[in-house]
Amino acid sequence: DRYMEVKKLLEVLTTAEHLKDVPRHCYTSGGRRESVAEHSWRLTLMAYWVSDEFPEVDLEKLLKMCLIHDLGEAFTGDVPTFEKTEKDEAKEAHFLTEWVAKFPSPFREEMQALYSEMEERQTLEAHIYKALDNLEALIQHNESDIDTWIPLEYDLQMTYGNDKVGFSKYLTALRDEVRNESKRKIAQKGSMK
């Protein structure tokens, strides 16, 4: 029986709401810092819109992975991937594990299973989620003003996520197009000097 008592639901939603105020490293096309919630929202849209490329995918599971993947950052904030250490990952996992353990059944077990599957990255859904997570960040960087990029991002836009898309021709093609957009953006910046 899937039921969450209303007070617990409001408590969970209040914690999740913090992601609206947790800034990510990247900027939006409008010039403000993107929030973790916005990243998760668009990642989920991406998963929905590419799902027809994967007829055997469990779409509900994939969408859930995308929705919950950064909930731990409600406790720790966002640490950019190029700065995140094992200690940062352990801290986020600790807070998330403690929080999820307080969920009522069956939500607790389902979320624990989803996080485990995402971490192990052995299923199609976990592979798609992780590839899209990387791609969404790259797309957002392309949509931001290049003046917000830090020097290392010029290289990251060429390489980040390459190791996550190889299982899919479609996602490889998407990664290639995102890289081409990055190259055009960099070339345009160079021609404006």
What are the language-model segments listed below?
Residues D1-K193:
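Alpha-helical, largely C-terminal catalytic domains
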